[in-house]
Amino acid sequence: MTDSHYIGRFAPSPSGELHFGSLIAALGSYLQARAQRGVWRVRIEDIDPPREVPGAAATILRQLEHYGLHWDGEVLWQSQRHEAYREALAWLHEQGLSYYCTCPRSRIQRLGGIYDGHCRTLCHGPENAAVRIKQQHPVMHFHDALRGDIQADPQLASEDFIIHRRDGLFAYNLAVVVDDHFQGVTEIVRGADLIEPTVRQLSLYKQFGWRAPGYVHLPLALNEQGAKLSKQNHAPALATGDPRPVLVQALRFLGQRDVVAWQEMSVEELLRFAVAHWRLTAVPTSANVNPAFSNASR
């Protein structure tokens, strides 16, 4: 039962199983939504087949359920949303807000990684071309409910970024904006590694004339080498046994009130306690090394 207009979401890509860093993002977004008696949705961002691991999407959903993170409504699959993305691309093209670009990656690398708008006035056709947004509304800063005002890199914010790839795949920034708007998401709670693309996504909201959601970027969990826990650096999957000690460790990572006698609680009771005592203001802003799960039993 919800009595709030708040809608949050967790949107993993099926490039591997969830790990502790994924749990931080999932749990943080879940608690932020439930604490406001809001809706919490799950979306599988399966628009990049070369990066996807067979069976990972089903495993991710099982992991969420195992950890007591039950979502509202049906899971949205980006692989079933291609028509919506095509419609968005067509609208931008009709409005003169996008163009075809044939510049190779090597040219952009020579420029330092920021595209210079070379193809903006060249009137290329779609053959062997990417589609770039014609940036009209660069966003130079935005408010993060945890971190305050975040300033963007001016060059990055002003760049004509890709919204449809040369290989025919829809770009992440386009798909995520179209889907968050479609799902009515009011606030996005995710990891701090996604701070940088936020200004691009906000500029797309302006291009489409849509109301943008709020943002919260949670601290990243790091490995012992100081690198972000990720599927790419082989972060271990979440434990398949008792989820409670891992949930307690995740709550501590998020700066939340310690759960006394959690061993006597069910997963559902533990999460109800966490929702009742959730404080976004207690969440740290700096990344931290993934703590040893065994410490949860202290």
Curated annotation (Swiss-Prot):
Enzyme class per UniProt: ligase
UniProt-annotated binding residues for L-glutamate: R9, F10, A11, P12, S13, E45, Y172, R190
An annotated GO BP: glutamyl-tRNA aminoacylation
Protein name: Glutamyl-Q tRNA(Asp) synthetase
A Gene Ontology molecular function term of the record: zinc ion binding
Cofactor: Zn(2+)
Keywords recorded for this protein, A-Z: Aminoacyl-tRNA synthetase, ATP-binding, Ligase, Metal-binding, Nucleotide-binding, Zinc
Matches recorded under NCBIfam families: PRK05710.1-1 (NF004312), PRK05710.1-3 (NF004314), queuosine_YadB (TIGR03838)
Protein residues bound to ATP: K231
CC annotations in GO: cytosol
EC number of this enzyme: 6.1.1.-
Cofactor binding comment, as recorded: Binds 1 zinc ion per subunit.
Annotated residues for binding of Zn(2+): C101, C103, Y115, C119
InterPro entries assigned: Glu-Q_tRNA(Asp)_Synthase, Glu/Gln-tRNA-synth, Glu/Gln-tRNA-synth_Ib_cat-dom, GluQ/Sye, Rossmann-like_a/b/a_fold
Primary role: Catalyzes the tRNA-independent activation of glutamate in presence of ATP and the subsequent transfer of glutamate onto a tRNA(Asp). Glutamate is transferred on the 2-amino-5-(4,5-dihydroxy-2-cyclopenten-1-yl) moiety of the queuosine in the wobble position of the QUC anticodon.
Gene3D superfamilies: HUPs
Species annotation: Salmonella typhi
Motif window: 'KMSKS' region: 228-232
Sequence motif: 'HIGH' region, positions: 12-22
Family to which this protein belongs: Belongs to the class-I aminoacyl-tRNA synthetase family. GluQ subfamily.
Gene name as annotated: gluQ
